[in-house]
């Protein structure tokens, strides 16, 4: 299932990767108080609408969630959304992106999650002290389905720089970012999701995850890392 910018799309493929059936749901971002955003309730409803269009859901062998990269979804320790979803469409992090690019000596675009996080810090936004998790749209949906707070390495590369040798967050850049957040009650290492490579175990659909999609998928369904 792909949560794209204009449509949520679901495609079932067979063992030879040929498409068998599909479903879709149209949605669009809204401009609210200077922020391009989507309502996460719409993401859930759209996902359910897509799944309801697929006939052989019980016969699925595995599933995966994809979505628009980048952006900023910040949650507290109980996974309550702290501020509306800030999508990749926003260009509101110029100061943070420039400063991080200089600090890391590595290009950090405005749309990256870490640029959004640091801009919120620079802005003195009240929610920053409550942050326990930041993630992307596909990883949020994956967490709601499986209870696993993970991100695929491709998706991760739009959150924070990746070390291609380890397939994980860049250690030297994590250390540099820590120097900027010493006054925060959290550490960036704890706030970011766990990075997985393609093919690694990313969890299975839980009972609560199945309920989250109105029972449209069977409990125990294995999931690929979200990308």
Show which residues each predicted segment covers.
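Gly/Thr-rich phosphate-binding beta-strand-loop-beta motif of the actin/hexokinase/Hsp70
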Residues: 1-20, 62-66, 71-75
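Residue-level structural signal for beta-strand termini and adjacent loop
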Residues: 13, 25-26, 87
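N-terminal phosphate-binding loop and adjacent alpha-helix
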Residues: 21-59, 105
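Glycine-rich phosphate-binding/catalytic subdomain of phosphoryl-transfer
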Residues: 52-227
């Amino acid at each position: 299932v792909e949560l794209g910018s204009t449509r949520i799309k679901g495609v079932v493929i067979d063992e030879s990767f040929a498409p068998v059936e599909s479903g879709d749901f149209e949605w669009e971002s809204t401009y609210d108080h200077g922020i391009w955003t989507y309502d996460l309730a719409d993401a859930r409803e759209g996902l359910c609408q897509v799944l309801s269009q697929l006939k052989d859901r019980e016969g699925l062998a595995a599933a995966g969630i994809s979505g628009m990269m980048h952006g900023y979804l910040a949650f507290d320790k109980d996974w309550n959304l702290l501020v509306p979803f800030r999508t990749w469409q926003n260009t509101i992090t110029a100061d943070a992106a420039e400063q991080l690019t200089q600090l890391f000596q590595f290009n950090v675009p405005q749309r990256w999650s870490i640029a959004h996080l640091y801009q919120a810090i620079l802005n003195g936004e009240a929610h920053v002290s409550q942050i326990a998790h930041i993630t992307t749209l596909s990883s949020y949906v994956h967490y709601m389905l499986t209870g696993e707070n993970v991100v695929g390495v491709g998706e991760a590369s739009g959150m924070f720089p990746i070390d291609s040798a380890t397939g994980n967050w860049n250690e030297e850049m994590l250390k540099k970012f820590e120097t900027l957040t010493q006054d925060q009650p959290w550490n960036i290492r704890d706030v970011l999701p766990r990075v997985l490579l393609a093919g690694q175990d990313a969890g299975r659909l839980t009972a609560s995850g199945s309920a989250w999609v109105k029972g449209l998928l069977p409990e125990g369904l294995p999931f690929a890392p979200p990308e």
